[in-house]
Amino acid sequence: MKYTSYFLALLLCVLLGFSGSYGQGQFFREIENLKEYFNASSPDVAKGGPLFSEILKNWKDESDKKIIQSQIVSFYFKLFENLKDNQVIQRSMDIIKQDMFQKFLNGSSEKPEDFKKLIQIPVDDLQIQRKAINELIKVMNDLSPKSNLRKRKRSQNLFRGRRASM
């Protein structure tokens, strides 16, 4: 389990490192700091294959990819939360978290707080379970694609109006 956390931290660093950053030099230094701390270059880290890389390859569509990325980001924030008392790597994790929020949540100031709230909701609390079930219909409706019916009707009416005036 310990090596899994190390490997995940390394993978996070690699994934974020390749996507570009405003402070790439510092970001890469923090990656190196984490790699050294977790001994991530050790051959045993690769045992069992990658955790997320293979999964991400299966998600081609950009909107679909965001779904799986949200789960991966959620995992990393939980990982960072478990390591929050480690002062040796705290600065590195803070920089990576900040960059992750910037990239994944498009720099919005409200979204990170909402995201943090969501990943901290306990699923074993009965009151939370009841609330979640109560909101399930609304959530499912939000997930459904919006109907283009109104847009089509407007377009058809506009087209008919042009034809009638010609």
From Swiss-Prot:
Residue positions with a glycan = N39, N106
A Gene Ontology molecular function term of the record = type II interferon receptor binding
Secretion signal: which residues?
A: 1-23
Family, according to the entry, reads as follows: Belongs to the type II (or gamma) interferon family.
What's the subunit arrangement here?
A: Homodimer. Interacts with IFNGR1 (via extracellular domain); this interaction promotes IFNGR1 dimerization.
Biological process terms from the Gene Ontology for this record are:
adaptive immune response; defense response to virus; humoral immune response; positive regulation of biosynthetic process
Q: Which domain of life is it from?
A: Eukaryota
Sum up the protein's function in the record's words: Type II interferon produced by immune cells such as T-cells and NK cells that plays crucial roles in antimicrobial, antiviral, and antitumor responses by activating effector immune cells and enhancing antigen presentation. Primarily signals through the JAK-STAT pathway after interaction with its receptor IFNGR1 to affect gene regulation. Upon IFNG binding, IFNGR1 intracellular domain opens out to allow association of downstream signaling components JAK2, JAK1 and STAT1, leading to STAT1 activation, nuclear translocation and transcription of IFNG-regulated genes.
- Native organism is Bos indicus
Q: In which tissues is it expressed?
A: Released primarily from activated T lymphocytes.
Query: What is the annotated localization of this protein?
Result: Secreted
Does the keyword field hold Secreted?
yes
A GO CC annotation given for this chain: extracellular space
**Gene3D superfamilies, alphabetized:** 1.20.1250.10
Q: Which residues carry this modification: Pyrrolidone carboxylic acid?
A: Q24
What InterPro entries is this protein classified in?
A: 4_helix_cytokine-like_core, Interferon_gamma
State what protein this is by name.
Answer: Interferon gamma
Cite the entry's keywords alphabetically: Antiviral defense, Cytokine, Glycoprotein, Growth regulation, Pyrrolidone carboxylic acid, Secreted, Signal
